[in-house]
Amino acid sequence: MAENGDKEQKLDSDTKICEQIEYYFGDHNLPRDKFLKQQILLDDGWVPLETMIKFNRLSKLTTDFNTILQALKKSKTELLEINEEKCKIRRSPAKPLPELNDEYKNSLKHKSVYIKGFPTSAILDDVKEWLKDKGPIENIQMRRTLQREFKGSIFIIFNTDDDAKKFLENRNLKYKDNDMTVLSREEYHAKKNEERKLNKSEEKAKSKQVKKEAQKQAEDAERKLVEERVGSLLKFSGDLDNMTSREDLHALFQTHGDIEWIDFSRGAKEGIVLFKMNAKEALDKAKAANSDNLKLKGKDVKWELIEGDTEKEALKKILEGKQESFNKRKGRDGRKFKGKGRGGKGNDSSSRKRTQFQGKKKTFDSSDDEDDMEESESPQKASVKAEESAGTKNGAAAAPGSPKKRSLDDKAEDGPAVKQSKTEVGDQ
């Protein structure tokens, strides 16, 4: 009994080792793995086992060369070859990588399935264990946030379209006590498109409501301001001197009422004065001081108190004109006080001539996960950085003068010591 258990455990271990190495050299990982692609170019595709055991997930399974070789010999895929010296492996030249054209990408979509409902604390091994009796799977993508936190959902790629269709026939699945959401990739994108349309419609309605409320608040504020100023307008008209100015009006009322604004242009025959106080009081005081004969620059003037709707319209126009004038003046003041650099050149001008570093630009991978737009650094770049960090394990010392390597404890779970890789690429 114990002997049979040991054999089963050994068989399971060999299967995991073989699957892991075949994943590294497989159709989904190899095109994205810059480090491994570089190694392949060095020796006609051969990669030393000494290099392979520095890959994180494989090193957790075994670092023994003989164990690796024995596991690979049991493989039925014929994907990998072992060299005569039994110290290197490579992808078989008889099984070249597929061409990454539209036809191939479409075939992947038809074999892809979206599954949601895993706890965010789940790891790749948990997911693989749950999937092990659900059909032959080529690739598992653990979907993550920009902060590398698991979202609780995955994309899996089956070996064939039929395998994916068979899996989709039974969608009443559970992970422990969690009900799972299962969709084909086409259904997933259709669902996301509908959600985006709905969100866009909701945002549009929300924006419209916000604008409507803002407009109402502005109108209420304006109405309140107008109501507060009722009784403060005084209209004047007549055969005015062409040289009459606003300064003349200020001089006329300076001891009788504070003037806030005058709507008048030199040469005009009428205008309106906005007082900070009641216009009738100011007019009565000015008339009393001038024997009830209030002239403007020696000319007879008709003075009128504006009332009712006419007053409200005039107040609205004057207050708008006052605000517009204030905004223009503020803009001129802002330009006026811009600093000058040496040589009399403005600092803003000189700064435009200098090229400034604006930080690392980020691109977004929108090929399949348009809804998530996960931040994307080249997966090849992430992989080579990861393998560089793995260079000190198993006695392999860093090259003289090379930068200090990170500890292998920083390695991620989905490849050879991945350094905070930005995009999830076939976690296996």
UniProtKB/Swiss-Prot annotation:
The keyword DNA repair does not apply. It holds the Pfam family La. Residues 366-377 have a biased composition (Acidic residues). The keyword Ligase does not apply. GO terms for cellular component: cytoplasmic stress granule; cytosol; nucleus; ribonucleoprotein complex. A motif (Nuclear localization signal) lies at residues 196-212, 316-332. Transmembrane segments: none annotated. Residues 187-223, 323-428 are annotated as: Disordered. PROSITE patterns: HTH_LA, RRM, XRRM. Residues 406-428 have a biased composition (Basic and acidic residues). Keywords: Nucleus, Phosphoprotein, RNA-binding. Residues 328-343, 352-361 have a biased composition (Basic residues). InterPro entries: La_dom_prot (IPR045180), La_HTH (IPR006630), La_xRRM (IPR014886), Lupus_La (IPR002344), Nucleotide-bd_a/b_plait_sf (IPR012677), RBD_domain_sf (IPR035979), RRM_dom (IPR000504), WH-like_DNA-bd_sf (IPR036388). CDD domains: LARP_3, RRM1_La, RRM2_La. It is found in: Nucleus. Residues 111-203 form the RRM domain. One of its GO terms (biological process) is tRNA processing. Phosphorylated. Residues 7-99 form the HTH La-type RNA-binding domain. La protein plays a role in the transcription of RNA polymerase III. It is most probably a transcription termination factor. Binds to the 3' termini of virtually all nascent polymerase III transcripts. There are two forms of La, LaA and LaB, in Xenopus. This is Lupus La protein homolog A. It comes from Xenopus laevis (African clawed frog).
